[in-house]
Amino acid sequence: MIYLDNAATSFPKPPQVLRAVAGVMMQPFGNPGRGGHKAALRAGRVTDACREAVAELLGGVPERVIFTLNCTDALNMAIRGLLHRGDHVLVTHDAHNAVMRPLAGLEQRGEITLSVLRANENGLIAPEAISEAVQPGTALCVLTHASNVTGTVQPVRALIAAAHGFGIPVLLDAAQSAGTLDLKDTGADMIAMPGHKGLLGPMGTGILYVGENVSPRPLREGGTGSASESVHQPDILPDRYESGTLQLPAIAGLLQGARFVRTHGAAIHEYETYLIDKLRSRLSAIPEVTVYGDGEAPRVGVLSFNLQGRECAEIADLLDRRGFCLRGGLHCAPCMHRWLGTQGTVRASVGPFSTEAEIDSLGDAIAQIVQVR
Ligand SMILES: Cc1ncc(COP(=O)(O)O)c(C=O)c1O
């Protein structure tokens, strides 16, 4: 099996991630923050170390690293925790439904209004798009760092600076960039990311980084193991946002994944871009194939394509039968497909352990599928 769906979740994970998950299941680890016995303290050291490793990747402070279930959970915490009735929100054409659905739900209930920022023909957003769309009640700007459909990377530092020029806080969806692109000094007020994609941790992990200038309302309240004399949710971080037992085995794996990308992240990005550019050149040479996204724009290891006159689901299915795991469809990004003018695409997304031979075989398989109708 050739796995090329790393944008959905990464596979394989580094061996130390697997060992860490198993280690927590096989030895006595207690509930982190609950109890003063050795097993609970040992568990607390794992969560502390993971917060530190992630904070280092972000150039942030550990207590502002909030563990979530996935990136969707982190985005919901930020969006629904921060917005108030009457707010106006800026969003982008490349937003995933993890951003769009919470926003569209609030809009449908009449609580907020939304504007989509204008993008250039290459899919990039310029800082002027923010000044054009801003309104007196604009309370949040949600940016997607890298598209999960085309892999195009937005100039987020310039966009965040532009939003801050109007006093607007920014939530950055780093689902497709965390682990490969540098997330230090982006200026984002909140960063949402999965632990199970580029950070190479297990499914069931995500992070919301909450910066100093924002304080979303917690969506989940309950026991934190701290301030137990009070029936009210504590204000201290990260406890304010982390009620209930954490997913310790998965967090132990995420710690190892975060350490791995801390050492290799830049090289991983270079390698993944090399592989995806190789695939782009191969596919671009086949007249029946349309490849989407600007090959010159900054990018991550994600590429979408279609075959003339064929449904993307059919192509993904034919590839699956040949042993390739690629995703066909809308990739939960309907606005992006409206912008591209597509009904869906086939998506290949590489990881640090993908190989050139796999990319060559995929190119061969697509060339064969084009021949056979
Ligand atoms: C850009 C983007 N945002 C958010 C998400 C949601 O991530 P998760 O599956 O961890 O909830 C994804 C998932 O593919 C994504 O690509």
Language-model segments: what does each one mean?
Residues 1-373:
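Pyridoxal 5′-phosphate
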